[in-house]
Amino acid sequence: MPEIARFYGIVITLLYKEHNPPHFHAEYGEFRASFDIETLKMTGSFPATAKNLVKKWAKPHQEELLKMWNSKKITKLPPLI
């Protein structure tokens, strides 16, 4: 899966060929989760602190993430600082 961001040990990936709803994946050590782009609802197992960091990162990038999903053009996004 193409990596679109990395911060605090969390790797964010997006694969637009997957099932709906539009979502992205996050990995943190042995933990894996997917996040709905529109609602940021999480599916999977992730530590609470890491989950909050992913949501904090994703909130200002929701429009860009959805555009990537729909256009099938993946680009890197800035990390959470």
What spans do the regions from the language model cover?
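Glycine-rich, flexible loop/turn motifs
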Residues: 3, 33, 42, 73-76
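Short, charged/polar N-terminal "headpieces" of proteins
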Residues: 1-20
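C-terminal structural segments of small proteins and small subunits
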Residues: 52-81
